[in-house]
A protein has these predicted regions:
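Sec-dependent N-terminal signal peptides of Gram-positive bacterial secreted proteins and lipoproteins
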Residues: 1-34
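Compositionally biased intrinsically disordered regions enriched in Thr/Gly
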Residues: 31-256
């Protein structure tokens, strides 16, 4: 049984929300990640199996989250934001589990068998220098069907102050200017590579570009970015500007 469309939309749009950590298994690791060059980074893990009354597991979640192992003022601010994001994810899992339980109980009532739902998150630090600390949380949720759905949440900080940055703030421009800039980058990419870049194909090149313009019209990239090698990498979710197989189609711009 496939979950409703609103469930997936909720997964992307709310990515979300805080919860008591006693609901699952939480452990801090002392092992730093290879990416650490300025801040020493460890990981916090979380895992929980949601079960029916008869003990059948219907939803399994696993998460690995970053945590800076320093106590400077900037590090504390970054950790507060990282912890908030981690708790949002765990809270969302708890919220989703109630809906998924209904699916599992319905299948059981009809004496049908379905695939166990699952959601797993890992992280990767893309920048850890004197300018930026930028990390991506990458998730993959499986709710039955031919394949699951990938999603991500990125957080970028001023490494000196610990301030969480939007893309507009990083570039020193308005949110409107930022989105105009990014949308132009996508259109330029289409002009150079067309459907070879993974965009939805149109009836012809002109039709495909128009379709991309329409898809980009209401998209906001102010938080859909991470920093790598001094560049802001912006991304669009699967299906936003291209088919599932194209994944996260991205463009980048050097931060001046």
């Amino acid at each position: 049984m496939k979950a409703g469309k609103h469930t997936l939309l909720k997964k992307f749009s709310t990515f979300a929300v805080a919860v008591s950590l006693s609901a699952g298994i939480l452990a801090a690791s002392a092992q730093p990640t290879e990416a650490a060059t300025t801040y020493q980074v460890g990981k916090v893990t979380y895992a929980k199996d949601y079960k029916l009354d008869d003990g059948t597991t219907y939803f399994t979640v696993k998460g690995k989250f970053p945590q800076i192992k320093e106590d400077s003022g900037a590090a504390k601010k970054i950790n507060q934001a990282l912890t908030k994001e981690k708790n949002r994810v765990i809270r969302q899992w708890k919220t989703d589990s109630a809906e998924y339980k209904k699916d599992a109980e319905e299948l059981k009532k009809e004496e049908l068998t379905g695939s166990e739902y699952g959601d797993e998150i890992t992280y990767k630090v893309y920048s850890n220098d004197e300018n930026y600390f930028s990390v991506m949380l990458s998730g993959y949720v499986f709710l039955g069907g031919a394949h699951g759905t990938p999603y991500r949440s990125c957080l970028t900080f001023n490494a000196q102050t610990g301030e969480k940055l939007t893309a507009a703030k990083a570039f020193g421009i308005s949110k409107k200017q930022l989105n105009q800039k990014v949308k132009k980058l996508y259109l330029d990419k289409y002009d150079k590579k067309g459907k070879e870049a993974g965009f939805f194909p149109g009836m012809n090149a002109k039709d495909g570009r128009k379709q991309l313009e329409n898809n980009l019209k209401n998209m906001d990239f102010n938080n859909n970015f991470y920093v790598k090698n001094g560049k802001a990498v912006f991304y669009a979710e699967p299906y936003a500007v291209g088919p599932y197989a194209a994944g996260f189609i991205s463009v980048s711009a050097t931060i001046q």
